[in-house]
A protein has these predicted regions:
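C-terminal domain-boundary segment and adjacent tail
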Residues: 193-196, 268-312
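Active-site gating loops and adjacent loop-to-helix segments of metal-dependent hydrolytic enzymes
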Residues: 109-134, 264-271
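N-terminal pre-catalytic segment of deacetylase/amide-hydrolase enzymes
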Residues: 6-11, 21-42
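Active-site beta-loop-alpha junctions enriched in small/polar residues
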Residues: 48, 75, 97-103, 167-169, ...
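Catalytic domains of cell-wall/extracellular-matrix polysaccharide-remodeling enzymes
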Residues: 140, 144-232, 241, 281
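A short alpha/beta connector and helix-capping loop motif
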Residues: 53-77
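Structural preference for beta-strand elements that scaffold enzyme active sites
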Residues: 40-42, 67-71, 91-97, 161-165, ...
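Acidic (Asp/Glu)-rich catalytic clusters
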Residues: 31-33, 58-64, 81-93, 110-123, ...
């Protein structure tokens, strides 16, 4: 090989290497077609289907346009109501809030799959465990059976989910085996999973399990129990003013503080009825709309993320 040919080969290799690096270094924002530095936000309502009060508040907020994404709890008593709404709003951004626990004292739910196929997931009464500490062992194979059952029921009732997430993060933050079970099911149904880089440090198996085509958000924000009720708007305003470039999801829990929701959640103040009313009030307020405009924050949905994952 002549010196000039060697030089050309080396230059070509360098160019190919640079090109490949650029592809892999491309941020999620760029994959979505936005300029680097753009602040993109998903305002995501959890727990739809749990009660009528949650469904009513969330759907009103979705119609107002400031809450623009949600996920549905298939095993819960009020899922049929929200499934009908999702079916009649096919352009809406509705994921499935994959559910394997039933944390309420008196307001309970259980698996979609037959109990005898998922015995490790239920208590002696056939409900999901209040907490997984109650179960001696959660069988990952049974988890997959139940996840498929929840997705299939949603599909049968006319819901076309845009993404998957996990109630109480049970499938995300309880080890690689369960996360991999969720990821296998997600890939089977060609659905993105809500995962954020914020979680990688504490749960390194997440990054190890994810492939190059999986969607990974940059940041997530959710309010914590130590925030006093009077400081609720301040917490969210500070978070929005300090929003970093990239794709962030605000995980919120809207609902109406009424007799139904107070009865369903009466054993706890965190994520209870008044908590959910505060979330609803802030995210439907003019104050929220104004700061979005002031900070040049653009709302996006999981539909856009799914298209990016497909390369469309």
């Amino acid at each position: 090989m002549t010196p000039s040919l060697i030089l050309r080969v080396l230059l070509l290799g360098s160019l190919l290497s640079t090109s490949t690096t650029r592809v892999f270094a491309q941020t999620l924002v760029e994959r979505l077609g936005y300029a680097p530095g753009t602040k993109l936000l998903i305002v995501h309502a959890d727990d739809l289907g749990e009660t009528h009060a949650v469904n009513a508040a969330a759907t009103k907020a979705l119609q107002g346009g400031t809450i623009n994404s949600a996920s549905l709890m298939v095993p819960c008593p009020w899922f049929p109501e929200i499934a009908d709404y999702a079916k009649s709003h096919p352009d809406g951004d509705f994921g499935l809030h994959l559910t394997l626990t039933s944390e309420r004292v008196y307001y309970r739910w259980g698996p979609v799959a037959p109990v005898d196929r998922v015995p490790s997931l239920v208590d002696r009464n056939g409900y999901f465990h209040h907490d997984w500490n109650e179960g001696e062992h959660i069988d990952a194979k049974e988890v997959e059976i139940e996840l498929r059952a929840q997705i299939e029921r949603a599909l049968a009732m006319g819901v076309r989910p845009t993404h998957l997430d996990s109630h109480q993060y049970r499938l995300i933050m309880n080890g690689k085996e369960l996360f991999d079970a969720m990821l296998r099911v997600a890939h089977e149904y060609k659905l993105p999973v809500f995962v954020t880089r914020d979680w990688f440090a504490d749960h390194p198996y997440l990054q190890a399990s994810l492939g190059p085509n999986d969607i990974v958000l940059d940041h997530t924000v959710t309010i914590e129990p130590e925030i006093p009720p009077k400081k609720w708007p301040e917490f969210y305003l500070i978070a929005l003013k300090n929003l970093k470039p990239g794709v962030t999801e605000f995980v919120i829990h809207p609902g109406y503080d009424n007799d139904e929701l107070r009865a369903a959640t009466r054993e706890r103040s965190t994520w209870g009825s008044a908590w959910r009313q505060r979330d609803y009030d802030f995210f439907t307020s003019d104050q929220f709309r104004e700061i979005l405009a002031q900070q040049k924050i653009k709302l996006i949905t999981w539909r856009e993320l799914a298209r990016a994952a497909e390369g469309k």
